[in-house]
Amino acid sequence: MKLGIVGLPNVGKSTLFNAITNAGVPADNYAFCTIDPNVGVVSVPDERLDWLSQLHKPKKTTPAVIEFVDIAGLVKGASKGEGLGNKFLSNIRTTDAIVHVVRCFEDSNINHVEGSTVPLRDIDIINLELVMSDIEMVERRIDKAQKAMKGGDKKFAHEVEVFTELLEHLNKGKLARTFDVSEEDRALIATSDLLTLKKTIYVANMSENEVNEPESSRHYMAVKTLADSEGSQVIPICAKLEADIAELDDPEEKAMFMEELGVAESGLHKLIKASYTLLGLISFLTAGSDECRAWTIKKGTKAPQAAGKIHTDFERGFIRAEVIAFDDMKACGTMAAAKAKGLVRSEGKEYVMKDGDIVNFLFNV
């Protein structure tokens, strides 16, 4: 999974990126300190994987990972080349979802590119640049389809119709993900890789004083209302606090520090949970003496396709899957005990994978 972190300059974007990835990239108090997109890969914490590793003592343990891309601060006119321009809009296209950091704190010592803290205005500035970029993409798509029609290929008529309606929607400043369309046509639109079609998590970057009671902040509530209206998620985070937590290496010291501050879970954990929920993702596990590993798949994935995540041969030659739920495995203590109780199931090609399944795939090629 790849998440692109966007936002106006000086909203706490790079500070948050540093905190969740421990990458130590510049987070200076001026616009465009992020010259190129910084990339950090973080492990997805999973207590189930930890337990399996303690049981099997494997040669290696491989958690699921999330790739975070810190994309340079966008400004008005980015879609037309202002600031750092189109290059950085193109970096967003390669991501699975967008993490939009919004400044929801007041601090006269930290410059705001627009001069004041108004979260919805800031969101509109970013979204408008994404919309403008999408308009260009859709116009090119329509032009290409119309040329194909003139060449005698009538199957593009419906494509022209759908994208023309979408263009009207975008020209009103609306996001592609709010375009009301059938599932079939939405799948067609998805082939165009539009920025405003991507699912979005808004990160409300708040002060230390407000982050534990976000509902008391009018800035946060404004962002939450917007997120709810478009089916997005919003997470209250204090990037500065996350940076302080990230500097502590000792787990016990970190836990004590978080408890003192009343922080129940880290911003990274919040982001991971929100991204899995928003993108409809689950994890299954494989375990043995060589390796214990967590694999990320979409909800609704069937066993052969899940096997294909490990190796294409597993999917091509799929025979069956030996499956046990993690909770059953943990309750039994060992695989032998689980088999003795009949808790290990044999599942075929139509089996839909569940979160926490421990699986052994049988295949033949």
Please place each PLM-identified region on the residue numbering.
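Glycine-rich, flexible loop/turn motifs
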Residues: 23-31, 38-40, 48-51, 80, ...
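Conserved Switch II/interswitch segment of TRAFAC-class P-loop GTPases
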Residues: 40-45, 72-82, 93-156, 169-182, ...
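Amphipathic alpha-helical transducer elements in NTP-driven molecular machines
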Residues: 32, 46-49, 62-68, 82-96, ...
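C-terminal-of-GTPase-core extension/linker across diverse P-loop GTPases
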Residues: 2-6, 17, 144-352, 359-365
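Conserved G1/Walker A P-loop phosphate-binding module
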Residues: 1-111, 139-140, 144-145
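Generic signal for short, ordered secondary-structure residues
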Residues: 14, 31, 67, 105, ...
